[in-house]
């Protein structure tokens, strides 16, 4: 064992002297990441291994540096002081300082907090400060006190909020609440977004208040945050509170409101979404978001609203979106979704003359997996458009490949079928 370790140490030194960084990484990984990393001989040579590892960090390329940081973290806290020195060295290569900051965050050690905090206060490199922000967030609860102090300084407040948002611990709630009324909209939005991940009684009143914030980014964060609390739907009358945001001045807020209402999973929410969808004043991007939201509501009424909307609107883009999202419906509403698609397919609706929409219907029927769609899909094999026929074949295979194949074989010699359907069935069987 000792001889093998000594051999690896010699090989590592030889690779270092030859500037063979790829080999050096391999030897260091075997020594430090291997099963024998706690062996007394390796522990005795830790300082030497640290020297080699740091030289690798300084001299390696991007990928080699990425790999060597894993070795550094396994060396333990002896690696922290030299990494701090690199971080503080303003003359050091930017990428090297980037790696030092990132690696310090992975240690989650109190010693690493102060230099990262100091960097946020004094350094002008925005990218490096972003890395330090993430690193502090990785440290978890040990960094909360230092980050809370950074909230007091206007210059570091936003970065501190971003770091706190990376720490999913309830201890961050109080410091985050302290900045929800900050003059800077970016800080208010970041704090509200972070608070939204906590099911704490102090948070919902803040989110409700922020619905009317002057800044759209803050309103959007509040809308999305409330969407994560369907458990409070009735207690806080969330559907009524969120509905006006469907008509916000900012379309991003409107889209967020559609998503959040969909999470309420109730008929009232579906009705509000339907009203928005069929309004002639609604921009098409918001209509598309609303169509998706109606599917996410997941109630029979929400799917029926989609069918009603399909018959009222005249946009080919919206028609296609409706038949596409119906294919993503989950149980227990899959049967209803299939029935709606089949009714559309068998109707005289102008959309059924459009190849792209027929293809989308076929695809959705295949995704829903209901056998009642087999015969209507077989009829699509007679379509004059090759894309429609191919989508019908794919859908039949997706439903039940064996059952569909048997059905086609039964029909292949049926003299009552049209020539187009005969040809379509023959092509489908050849594709099987």
Predicted features and spans:
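Alpha-helical adaptor scaffolds
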Residues: 346-363, 375
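TPR/TPR-like (Sel1-like) alpha-helical repeat modules
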Residues: 29-33, 409-416
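Short amphipathic alpha-helical interaction patches enriched in hydrophobic/aromatic residues
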Residues: 226, 326, 348-349, 415
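N-terminal "cap/leader" segments of large eukaryotic alpha-helical scaffolds
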Residues: 1-29, 35-36, 47-59, 66
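Short inter-helical turns and helix N-cap capping residues of alpha-solenoid HEAT/ARM repeat scaffolds
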Residues: 17-20, 60-61, 90-93, 123-125, ...
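Amphipathic alpha-helical scaffolding segments comprising HEAT/armadillo-like alpha-solenoid repeats
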Residues: 5-9, 40-58, 77-89, 109-122, ...
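Structural detector for internal amphipathic alpha-helices that build alpha-solenoid repeat scaffolds
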Residues: 10-14, 26-44, 64-77, 95-109, ...
